[in-house]
Amino acid sequence: MSKHKNQRTARTLEKTWDTLNHLIVISSCLYRLNLKSIAQIALSVLAMIISTSLIIAAIIFIISANHKVTLTTVTVQTIKNHTEKNISTYLTQVPPERVNSSKQPTTTSPIHTNSATISPNTKSETHHTTAQTKGRITTSTQTNKPSTKSRSKNPPKKPKDDYHFEVFNFVPCSICGNNQLCKSICKTIPSNKPKKKPTIKPTNKPTTKTTNKRDPKTPAKMPKKEIITNPAKKPTLKTTERDTSISQSTVLDTITPKYTIQQQSLHSTTSENTPSSTQIPTASEPSTLNPN
């Protein structure tokens, strides 16, 4: 059926390609005849046909791909069913004894004894032998099984509070009681309680006094004396004799004009009061009067 569908799709694609070629030839002829409007219509029709053909081809491709996917899934399922059937038939055909012998190479037949005919000493011996055989079987099975768990470098940290709820791979000795065989197999449960660290008290060490000893070669350094500077005193002005004479002369110069002015005023007043020298004759000069 799939082959027929592929042939049909191939034929439809060929037909569409032929029609497209014919339309291209017709549009070129119309352009040569200067019939632009008709050529434009033909080109638009051609574009529509191309788009529809592409859409159809995509749909066909998707359908064929889905059909292939469904075929592959069906084949895988059939293979799985076939293998499961083969395994189940093989297991039914092979007896369980062979399977057990392959898994447990060192098996021993159990010892059956009548309890009425055997004394208690023999009972204890038979119990001991059965326990030994069971122990051997368990050890052989444990060694033959491969370890599937991946060993991690950092094991998971156990909580600190779970001291009594741990699952152990060995028998605890508290269950055994007086049974010596159980005591030989059992192991004591390790106590995971944190041990108390011994408290170390700090010892008081004697304090050593350190004295600053000076070497005899190095001279002792004298402490520097601080220079005390007195506040600057104002210099006293020393007056020389020349300076004093100059100052006195300046004072006299300032005083004399006033004194001279006073003398002149007094002289003028006295001259007015006294008669003139021409009017008053002196005793030495003789009086020369003209007789009229």
Curated annotation (Swiss-Prot):
Site positions (Cleavage): 65-66
InterPro entries: G_prot
Residue intervals passing through the bilayer: 38-66
Cytoplasmic side: 1-37
A Pfam family annotated for this UniProt entry: Glycoprotein_G
Positions bearing carbohydrate: 70, 72, 81, 86, 92, 100, 113, 138-139, 141, 199, 203, 236, 254, 271, 276, 284
Biased composition (Basic and acidic residues): 212-227
One CC-aspect GO term: host cell plasma membrane
Topological domain spans for side Extracellular: 67-292
Region Binding to host heparan sulfate: start-end pairs: 187-198
Covalent S-S links between cysteines: 173-186, 176-182
Keyword Secreted: yes
Biased composition (Low complexity): 200-210
Positions of the UniProt region annotated as Disordered: 92-161, 189-292
Composition skew (Basic residues), residue ranges: 148-157
Domain of life of the native organism: Viruses
UniProt keyword annotations, A-Z: Disulfide bond, Glycoprotein, Host cell membrane, Host membrane, Host-virus interaction, Membrane, Secreted, Transmembrane, Transmembrane helix, Viral attachment to host cell, Viral immunoevasion, Virion, Virus entry into host cell
Biased composition (Polar residues): 99-142, 245-292
GO terms, biological process: symbiont entry into host cell; virion attachment to host cell
Stated family: Belongs to the pneumoviruses glycoprotein G family.
UniProt protein name: Major surface glycoprotein G
Naturally occurring in which organism (per UniProt): Human respiratory syncytial virus B (strain 18537)
